[in-house]
């Protein structure tokens, strides 16, 4: 589990309908719950459900940030907002919290609050585009599950998010943008890690747009190398995993 996450969980009891954990932390919580290994991650990625958000949550979150003593408080600009808080005063708090809101005014700031501009890197830009997409945002709202009292995006819904991030970052790099290859590889590997939780009977309905993205991902991944052994995945191969993903999302008859 991410260092310091226990205190976070305790602080936000009662607000479970107002946010969902995505990204590496969601994967970590889900995999740990199934007693499977996952890569190390130090940041907590949170998406706010703007239809449910309350002023109380915003105030509680700001109090938590102050209590944790985060040294660096950053905020992006634009219609949607990214907030990043890093370097807390102790390991009782997550090293980094990244929070995304389609509503820029969810946090009630005090007069002396200082938020410095947040540089928009490839990861933030990609995630922002995905979460501002209505189809993916709807999947996020309907695809949640509870793991040890924490709302997280379920494995079958996390996989399309990871696949879309891989497609997006890969396309940007091919177009000449500066994109860290490690981030591209990370999303690809996470799809295969999460696929361990899918069985022959697992099914997930996707919107037409997301289904097309998943088909594109599975088609393009066919030419990619995936080192399953290094991911701790045994007893299967890449072809079997991709076939199971086609079946899970009902894509097989259309490929």
What are these regions (language model features)?
Residues 1-255:
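Compositionally biased terminal segments of proteins
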């Amino acid at each position: 589990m991410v260092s310091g996450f226990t205190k976070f969980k305790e602080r936000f009891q009662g607000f479970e309908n107002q946010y969902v954990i995505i990204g590496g932390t969601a994967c970590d919580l889900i995999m740990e719950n199934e007693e499977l290994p996952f890569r190390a991650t130090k940041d907590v990625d949170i998406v706010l459900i703007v239809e449910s958000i309350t002023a109380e949550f915003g105030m509680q979150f700001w109090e938590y940030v102050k209590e944790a003593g985060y040294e660096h408080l950053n905020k992006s600009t634009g219609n949607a907002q990214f907030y990043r808080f890093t370097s807390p005063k102790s390991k009782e708090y997550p090293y980094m919290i990244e929070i995304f809101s389609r509503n820029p005014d969810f946090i009630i700031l005090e007069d002396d609050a200082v938020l410095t501009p947040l540089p928009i890197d490839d990861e933030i830009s990609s995630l922002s585009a995905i979460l501002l997409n209505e189809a993916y945002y709807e999947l996020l709202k309907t695809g949640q599950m509870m793991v040890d009292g924490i709302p997280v995006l379920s494995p079958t819904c996390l996989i399309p998010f990871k696949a879309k991030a891989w497609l997006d970052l890969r396309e940007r790099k091919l177009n000449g943008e500066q994109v860290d290859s490690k981030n591209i590889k990370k999303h690809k590997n996470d799809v295969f890690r999460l696929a361990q939780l899918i069985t022959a009977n697992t099914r997930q309905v996707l919107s037409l747009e997301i289904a097309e993205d998943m088909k594109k991902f599975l088609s393009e991944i066919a030419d990619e190398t995936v080192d399953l052994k290094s991911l701790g995945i045994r007893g299967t191969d890449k072809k079997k995993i991709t076939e199971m993903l086609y079946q899970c999302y009902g894509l097989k008859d259309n490929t």
